[in-house]
Regions:
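Amphipathic alpha-helical repeat elements characteristic of tetratricopeptide repeat
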Residues: 13, 78, 89, 107-111, ...
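Hydrophobic packing residues in well-ordered alpha-helices of helical domains and bundles
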Residues: 84, 110, 127, 131, ...
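Amphipathic alpha-helical dimerization/coiled-coil segments
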Residues: 92-126
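C-terminal all-alpha effector/ligand-binding and dimerization domain
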Residues: 118-119, 164-213
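Amphipathic coiled-coil alpha-helices
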Residues: 91, 113, 120-123, 130-133, ...
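Short linear motifs at protein or domain termini
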Residues: 1-101, 207, 212
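Hydrophobic, amphipathic alpha-helical faces that serve as interaction scaffolds
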Residues: 87-102, 132-170
Length: 213
């Protein structure tokens, strides 16, 4: 762990941001316990801000807590990856069913995220944060708050899966940019079939990049 110095942010926020980035980069297959003392030293804070950050991360699904043992990051198995991507396919393809009524402004918002991702290609955590933002925007465009909340519940697992995919030395980031562009082009052309095909291709490529089959 690389020790950091707190900035103008509050100490709980410093601890939270550092731990979220650290967790996103962990091997997804491994269970990792988090030591409050080590985290306090590494983030340049103290145990109280670390505990506050852990409670926030627990609420968001990034960590789990065991009484008398502390917090840990649960593993994400290959079957988990497949199940998550299958769920995403159902939700995302439903969400774009209203493509004909999407405004140019909505579609322009997708393009802006792609442009930001292009600038963040060398920062896997930021790149995947933007990736999640891209897909969340797509789901929200569907106008179903229940599905949007369900999709949001997958956020922490999507971050870890995505960071793993773009950190393996291949040009997965470049592939993602091209795949996202195909989705946006389909939306701009108001073609539901093309949008569905682009979403399926994108999620299939993600699965292959992460688990290899």
């Amino acid at each position: 762990m690389i020790q950091m110095t707190p900035t103008a942010q509050s100490q709980p926020e410093v601890a939270y941001q550092w731990m979220k980035s650290y967790i996103a980069a962990l091997p997804r297959e491994e269970e990792t316990f988090l030591n409050e003392g080590v985290l306090a030293k590494t983030t340049g804070t103290s145990r109280t801000p670390v505990r506050e950050a852990l409670l926030r991360l627990e609420a968001e699904g990034f960590v789990k807590r065991v009484p008398h043992k502390g917090a840990y990051v649960p593993p994400i198995s290959d079957p988990d990856v497949r199940a998550i991507l299958q769920a995403r396919a159902v939700v995302e393809k439903w969400a774009v069913s209203a493509v004909e009524s999407m405004s140019d402004a909505q579609i322009d918002a997708f393009q802006r995220i792609i442009d930001q991702q292009q600038e963040a290609r060398e920062d896997p955590a930021r790149f995947i944060e933007l990736d999640t933002e891209f897909h969340t925007l797509m789901v929200r465009a569907g106008g179903n708050p229940v599905l949007a909340d369900f999709y949001a519940s997958l956020r922490q697992k999507q971050l870890r899966i995505g960071v793993k995919a773009v950190s393996q030395g291949t040009d997965r980031a470049g592939d993602v940019l091209r795949e996202h562009q195909l989705i946006v082009d389909a939306l701009r052309g108001r073609s539901l079939d093309a949008a569905h095909q682009a979403i399926d291709a994108h999620l299939d490529s993600t699965r292959l990049a992460v688990i290899g089959y």
